Amino acid sequence: QWPDPSSDIPP
């Protein structure tokens, strides 16, 4: 189960 890239938004 990979983390959603869309939810991995940099600051």
Curated annotation (Swiss-Prot):
The protein's UniProt keywords, in alphabetical order, are: Hypotensive agent, Metalloenzyme inhibitor, Metalloprotease inhibitor, Protease inhibitor, Pyrrolidone carboxylic acid, Secreted, Toxin
Which range is the signal sequence, renumbered to this chain? none
GO annotation, cellular component aspect: extracellular region
Q: Does the keyword rRNA processing apply?
A: no
Q: Name one GO biological process term.
A: regulation of blood pressure
Where does the protein principally reside?
Answer: secreted
GO MF, one annotated term? toxin activity
Q: Which residues carry this modification: Pyrrolidone carboxylic acid?
A: Q1
Q: Which tissue types show expression of this protein?
A: Expressed by the venom gland.
Subcellular localization: Secreted
Q: Report the function annotation for this chain.
A: This peptide both inhibits the activity of the angiotensin-converting enzyme (ACE) and enhances the action of bradykinin by inhibiting the peptidases that inactivate it. It acts as an indirect hypotensive agent.
Similarity field: Belongs to the bradykinin-potentiating peptide family.
Instruction: Write down what this protein is called.
Output: Bradykinin-potentiating peptide 11
